[in-house]
Amino acid sequence: MQRREALKSLAILTGGAVLIPSCNFEKEDILAAYSNLQITSSLQTLLGEIANAIIPPAQLKGAADLAVQDFILVMVNDCLDKDQQTQFTKGLQEFNAFSKKTGGVNFSKLEPSVKEKVITEGLAIAADTADENLKSVREFLATTKRFTI
């Protein structure tokens, strides 16, 4: 009878040993999940700062505390079509230039009230603007706001 228990325990232990390596959730693996977007860790950090400006930390947790940027990237990677993904990525890459033009410095160095102003101005860009970069920033901010909220 003890032989059966030993074999059963050995089978469970072996199964667990086989499964454990596949349960690795390091940051590098998370970035690989966004293969359609080609997002770098610095762009992911910028997206987190933008989401945190939309939902700032107060008595409740802010967007950065909840890792909303990962949710946004998964939704964009999995739910939007290729053109929308390209528009989102282009807007994310152009956002710091827009922030420098509007607020004077990179977005991460701005005060929270100025960050809010930059986002508001980005969302207020006319849909029929001739500048493709501004149009990309507007679409990026609208998508980010929608998935953040």
What is the predicted function of each stretch?
Residues 37, 53-68:
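Long, well-ordered alpha/beta core segments of mature domains
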Residues 23-28, 63-70:
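Short alpha-helical hairpin
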Residues 1, 5, 20-53:
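C-terminal segment of N-terminal export signals and the immediately downstream linker at the start
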Residues 37, 41, 62, 82, ...:
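Charge-dense, low-complexity intrinsically disordered segments
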Residues 45, 49, 53, 67-149:
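Mature-region segments of soluble proteins
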Residues 5-24, 111:
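N-terminal export signals
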